[in-house]
C-alpha cells in the first residue's frame, strides 16, 4: 500500500492507525491536525493505465485558486509514459548502469563529484558553505493536490507524487518508512494536504538533518503570487502554493517555506526541491539562479553590500539571531535608495544558506505550468520531464539535467524549468539525489 492510500479513518476522531503507516515511524507527529474542514467523503473507484485505487472526493473550497494571465489552467496533450513503461525504463537503466541518454540529449561535460571540504564565497571568501555527499539518511516529502470538484481541478498531481515515490524507492534507495505523502484522495486526517499538515510535514522533513543527509521535497499543485512584503522579489510578488483548504486557512508563502525548510539546515545537508506549479521560479527564495549555459543569471549579490551585509549573511548562516537583527537594520538603512525603494538584489543576501539546497521549478515567476495527460495517465509536465530525463540518463550534471528537461518540454510547452541554489555551484558537478 502506498503512503496516502490508507484505509478510510477520517471521522473527526484521532487516527487510530497512523503510527503503523508508512512515513510516520520516524518522528512524524501523529497528533490530530489543529484545523479540520472535511468529513468522511464518498468513495469512488477510478482506474488508471496500470493501477486502480480509490479517490476520496473532498468538498471543494469555497473558491478556486486565482485565474492566471493565460486564462484557465491549461491541460495540453503531452507524452508522459504509462506507469508500466516508466517502471521498465527505471529498471533497465538501473540494471545496465546506462550513462548516455538519447542522442539528442546534452551529455555532461567533465562531470565530477562535489568536493567534501568546506567552500567559501563572498568578499574575501569569508562566507562558508558545504556540499552534501548524499551518503547519509534520506527523507522525502511528496505533496500532490488535485483539488477535486473545484473549478480549476487538476488531474495529474496525485499521480506525480506516486510516480515520484516509485522513482525514489526503486532508483535512489529511499526507504518507504522515510517518505511522507500528502494527497487529497485520502481520508486519513494527518495525510490530507491542509495548510497545517503541509507546514508540519515540512518541519518533519528537515528535523534532525545532519551533514551528508539527502532530503527531497516535491510539490505538484496550484501556485500563484501575492504582494511581496520584504523586498526580496524582483517582480514585487512573492510566490505561493495552495493547500487544499487555502480558502479557509490561506496559502503558503515562499518566505515561510524558506524559513521552515532552508534556514534550519546545517552546512553539508542537501535539500533537493522540485516544484511543479505555476509562478514557481523563486518559490524557495534561493539567491542564485542559473541559466542553461551554467552561469549565474542574477548580478553578484555580494557586490557593494558592505560590512553590514556581510555580517548579516554570516549571522544568518550561523543562526546568530541577535547579530542578524542588528546587522539587518544597518543593511536596510544602507540599501534603501533615494526613492525609498529597497534594492532587492542586496536584500537577497540574507537568503544565503551554508547548506546545500537545490531547487528545480516548473516555470519562471511569470509563467504557468502545464497539467498533461495521455491514455489515462495524467501528470504534471515538469514532474514528467524530471523523471523522464533521469530514467533515460541517470548520471547527469546539474547543467545537463536542466538543459535536458528544457529540451523535453520545449517542443510542446512555453514553460522553462529553472535551477536555483542556496549558494554558488559548479554546474558541472554530478547531480546527486
Swiss-Prot record:
Protein keywords: Apoptosis, Hydrolase, Protease, Thiol protease, Zymogen
Entry keyword annotation includes Protease: yes
EC number, as in UniProt: 3.4.22.-
Single GO MF descriptor: cysteine-type endopeptidase activity
Top-level taxon: Eukaryota
UniProt entry tagged with the keyword Nucleus: no
GO CC entries: cytoplasm
Pfam family, one: Peptidase_C14
Region (Disordered): 1-123
Biased composition range(s): Low complexity: 9-44
InterPro entries, A to Z: Caspase-like_dom_sf, Metacaspase, Pept_C14_caspase
Coiled-coil annotated spans: none
GO biological process, any: apoptotic process
Record: active site: 222, 278
Family per similarity comment: Belongs to the peptidase C14B family.
Primary role: Involved in cell death (apoptosis).
Protein name: Metacaspase-1
Organism in which the protein naturally occurs: Kluyveromyces lactis (strain ATCC 8585 / CBS 2359 / DSM 70799 / NBRC 1267 / NRRL Y-1140 / WM37) (Yeast)
Amino acid at each position: 500500500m502506498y503512503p496516502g492510500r490508507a484505509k478510510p479513518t477520517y471521522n473527526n476522531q484521532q487516527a487510530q492507525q497512523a503510527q503503523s503507516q508508512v512515513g510516520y515511524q520516524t518522528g512524524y507527529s501523529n497528533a490530530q491536525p489543529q484545523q479540520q474542514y472535511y468529513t468522511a467523503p464518498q468513495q469512488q473507484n477510478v482506474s488508471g493505465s496500470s493501477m486502480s485505487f480509490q479517490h476520496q472526493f473532498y468538498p471543494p473550497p469555497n473558491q478556486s485558486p486565482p485565474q492566471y494571465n493565460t486564462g484557465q489552467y491549461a491541460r495540453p496533450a503531452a507524452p508522459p509514459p504509462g506507469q508500466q513503461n516508466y517502471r521498465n525504463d527505471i529498471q533497465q537503466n538501473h540494471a545496465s548502469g546506462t550513462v548516455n541518454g538519447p542522442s539528442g540529449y546534452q551529455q555532461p561535460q567533465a562531470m565530477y563529484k562535489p568536493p567534501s571540504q568546506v567552500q567559501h564565497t563572498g568578499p574575501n571568501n569569508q562566507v562558508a558553505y558545504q556540499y552534501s555527499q548524499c551518503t547519509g539518511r534520506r527523507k522525502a516529502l511528496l505533496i500532490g493536490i488535485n483539488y477535486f470538484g473545484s473549478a480549476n481541478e487538476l488531474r495529474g498531481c496525485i499521480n506525480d507524487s506516486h510516480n515520484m515515490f516509485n522513482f525514489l524507492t526503486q532508483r535512489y534507495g529511499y526507504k518507504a518508512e522515510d517518505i511522507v505523502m500528502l494527497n487529497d484522495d485520502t481520508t486519513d486526517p494527518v495525510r490530507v494536504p491542509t495548510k497545517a499538515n503541509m507546514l508540519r510535514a515540512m518541519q518533519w522533513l528537515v528535523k534532525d538533518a545532519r551533514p551528508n543527509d539527502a532530503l527531497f521535497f516535491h510539490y505538484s499543485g496550484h501556485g500563484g503570487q501575492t504582494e511581496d512584503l520584504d523586498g526580496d522579489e524582483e517582480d514585487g510578488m512573492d510566490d505561493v502554493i495552495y493547500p487544499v483548504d487555502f480558502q479557509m486557512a490561506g496559502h503558503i508563502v515562499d518566505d515561510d517555506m524558506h524559513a521552515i525548510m532552508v534556514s534550519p539546515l546545517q552546512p553539508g545537508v542537501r535539500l533537493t526541491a522540485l516544484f511543479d506549479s505555476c509562478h514557481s521560479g523563486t518559490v524557495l527564495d534561493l539567491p542564485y539562479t542559473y541559466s542553461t549555459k551554467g552561469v549565474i543569471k542574477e548580478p553578484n549579490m555580494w557586490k557593494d553590500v558592505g560590512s553590514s551585509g556581510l555580517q548579516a549573511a554570516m549571522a544568518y548562516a550561523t543562526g546568530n539571531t541577535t547579530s542578524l537583527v542588528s546587522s539587518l537594520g544597518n543593511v536596510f538603512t544602507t540599501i534603501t535608495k533615494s526613492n525609498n525603494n529597497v534594492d532587492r538584489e542586496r536584500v537577497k543576501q540574507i537568503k544565503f544558506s551554508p547548506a546545500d539546497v537545490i531547487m528545480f521549478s516548473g516555470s519562471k515567476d511569470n509563467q504557468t505550468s502545464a497539467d498533461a495527460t495521455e491514455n489515462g495517465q495524467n501528470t504534471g509536465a515538469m514532474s514528467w520531464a524530471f523523471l523522464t530525463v533521469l530514467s533515460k540518463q541517470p548520471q547527469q550534471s546539474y547543467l545537463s539535467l536542466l538543459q535536458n528537461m528544457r529540451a523535453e518540454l520545449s517542443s510542446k510547452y512555453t514553460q522553462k524549468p529553472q535551477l536555483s541554489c542556496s549558494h554558488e555551484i559548479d554546474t558541472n558537478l554530478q547531480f546527486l539525489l
